[in-house]
Curated annotation (Swiss-Prot):
This is Histone H2B. InterPro entries: Histone-fold, Histone_H2A/H2B/H3, Histone_H2B, HISTONE_H2B_site. CDD domains: HFD_H2B (cd22910). It comes from the Eukaryota. It comes from Holothuria tubulosa (Tubular sea cucumber). One of its GO terms (molecular function) is DNA binding.
Amino acid sequence: MAPKAPGKGAKKAAKSKAPRAPGDRKRKRTRRESYSIYIYKVMKQVHPDTGISSRAMSIMNSFVNDIFERIAAEASRLAHYNRKSTITSREVQTAVRLLLPGELAKHAVSEGTKAVTKYTTSK
């Protein structure tokens, strides 16, 4: 067996950082919220062998944000018309029916109802 070369595998001394002043703090990274992990999970359920580029993910994230804002605004408007201060699942359901066309609205309402039922039974 050949002898090991000196220095190979030897641990290097840790570099010492310059001491910070008492007022200096490391800047905390701001969190960017997105729907990308959820979009990815749904995509893998529907098409397990398909990938998605970061640009396509950005477009999908913008789309989900846009639809969310439209539904929230419409639900808020409906609650205001009925002199209610709370947006309930009824307002959201009506907003979805108003915003989405035909069959898409029916599917969205049924999936939403299913999600709300699952949530209430798990509590």
